[in-house]
A protein has these predicted regions:
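Conserved glycine-rich cofactor-binding loop
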Residues: 10
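N-terminal phosphate/diphosphate-binding loop that engages ATP/GTP or pyrophosphate donors
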Residues: 3, 17-89, 93, 98-102
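Extreme N-terminus of proteins, especially the signal/transit-peptide cleavage junction
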Residues: 1-2, 106
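Hydrophobic anchor at the beta1->P-loop junction of P-loop NTPases
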Residues: 6-7
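Conserved glycine(s) of the Walker
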Residues: 13-14
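Switch II (G3) loop of P-loop NTPases
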Residues: 95, 99-103, 107-122
Length: 122
């Protein structure tokens, strides 16, 4: 399986747009592809759930109900700050483990979208 990490210089620089386009491109080329957004901040609360627009866009592009996110944070700041504030020890090995879950392994290609900009320490 091949994986690509999608990052950018800042938040709102077009990572989700590019991820969505790549999912559509690879699907058109008959390549089984899944987009993942393991960590997201700036979420909206809906009852007991958090919703993140980027996660929703990628899930729609995936045409799948697989959970592509494991860490959602309400505050619109760098996820490592929010995680530390909440006592969550979010480490890169945890994110890598999430991206290697069995349900993602049947795909030929994983597109993993980062959170925030290039220098976010996750």
């Amino acid at each position: 399986m091949t994986s690509f990490f999608i990052t950018g210089t800042d938040t709102s620089c077009g990572k989700t747009y590019v991820t969505r386009l790549l999912i559509h491109y690879f699907r058109h080329k008959q390549i089984r592809c899944i987009g993942l957004k393991p960590v997201a901040s700036g979420c909206e609360r809906h009852g007991d759930d958090f919703i993140n627009e980027d996660v929703e866009i990628i899930m729609q592009a995936n045409q799948s109900n697989l959970a592509i996110n494991n860490w959602l944070f309400e505050q619109p700041v760098s996820p490592h700050f929010v995680a530390a504030d909440k006592g969550i020890n979010l480490q890169s090995k945890d994110i890598v483990s999430f991206c290697h879950r069995p349900e993602f392994m049947s795909y030929q290609l994983r597109l993993i979208e980062g959170a925030g900009g290039l220098m976010v320490p996750l």
